[in-house]
Regions:
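Long, histidine/aromatic-enriched segments associated with O2/redox biology
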Residues: 1-313
Length: 313
């Protein structure tokens, strides 16, 4: 089956002005009752999007909803499993590890109006709240000029247009789950005081790009462990990509400043390789960043959501 972008969820780079990431655990008290709610949610989620989009005159609304491996096995024990959906166990690094945080359900809502984001999440949670508990809820925002909270432009090397589809959406290599995607969600907190104390030239060496012009440095200008050096997957002399967003979040009164990384990928193995390289090759950005969470989810296609709604999985 060929990829049909009209049948994918919103797994492309459209960070939005207002962002909500919510991860949930199922109560696991009554599987049949919980499955019924999930089936209802799968049926309603696109209707909620259409309704709110009409009332809000668009506002750039995007929604992605997905399942962890444990949730998939619990809810759909007799169904086939997406080929690369695994129970994420974390990644061992040299100085820091990628933590694995238990979660069953993933919700990523973004729009250009905070009231729209709130309305969508609130309506979805009306259904999910009785059968779940919240693992994490993070509210992100659009930072100046589309920059990450570390003040560098975000996503310059992201695949775009057809290339984004090729790297972000499952194809015919897994025909039962074509048009789906693998989402890796990871929350970081930064020591921005220490980061901002660095000279701009040092920050640029550690990132691999100019801070203000966003021009990539020459290889000999970069630190050997620069972020845009070690965070790549260049196996077989080919650059493998994902669709990534680094969404700023903060509680300034508490001194908390961070990034919520979300990577949508056709191949989870690509994201995993990038993370492994970062943490085993001591990405310089990690000297100023602490990983808080790590979670892998499968984002079903609209056809798979329809099958869930109809009880066909």
């Amino acid at each position: 089956m060929a990829v049909d972008v009209s049948r994918t969820q919103d797994v492309y780079k459209d960070a939005g002005q207002s962002v909500n990431f919510t991860t949930l655990l199922l109560n696991r008290k009554d599987r049949d009752a919980e499955l019924e709610v999930i089936q209802d949610m799968a049926d309603r989620i696109q209707a909620i999007k259409r309704s709110v989009s009409i009332r809000a005159n668009g506002e750039g609304l995007g929604i992605a909803f997905g399942f962890s491996r444990k949730a998939w096995d619990y809810l759909f024990p007799n169904a086939p499993v997406p080929k690369e959906l695994e129970d994420f166990q974390g990644i061992k690094g040299d100085k820091q590890d990628v933590p694995a945080v238990a979660a069953d359900l993933f919700l990523h809502v973004r729009s250009n109006d905070e009231s729209v984001t709130y309305t969508v999440v609130d309506q979805i949670m009306e259904f999910l709240r009785p059968i779940t508990s919240v693992v994490d809820e993070t509210h992100g925002f659009h930072y100046e000029q589309g920059r990450a909270i570390i003040d560098f432009v975000d996503g310059t090397e992201n695949p775009v247009s057809q290339e984004a589809v090729e790297w972000g959406v499952i194809g015919d290599e897994d025909p039962e789950f074509t048009n789906g995607s693998y989402a890796f969600a990871q929350k970081y907190e930064h020591d921005l005081d220490a980061w901002r104390a660095l000279p701009t030239e040092m920050q640029e060496k550690f990132i691999g790009r100019r801070k203000f012009s966003d021009i990539e440095l020459e290889d000999d200008e970069k630190d050997p462990a620069a972020h845009n050096v070690v965070s790549q997957d260049n196996r077989d002399d080919k650059e493998h990509k994902i669709v990534r967003m680094n969404v700023p979040f903060a509680q300034p009164g508490q001194g908390v400043r961070g990034t919520y990384f979300i990577g949508y990928a056709r191949y989870w193995d690509v994201t995993k390789t990038m993370l492994t390289n970062m943490f085993t090759q001591n990405d310089k950005l990690l000297d100023y960043s602490k990983p808080i969470t790590g979670m892998l989810f499968f984002i079903p296609s609209l056809d798979t959501l329809d099958a869930i709604a109809e009880g066909e999985l």
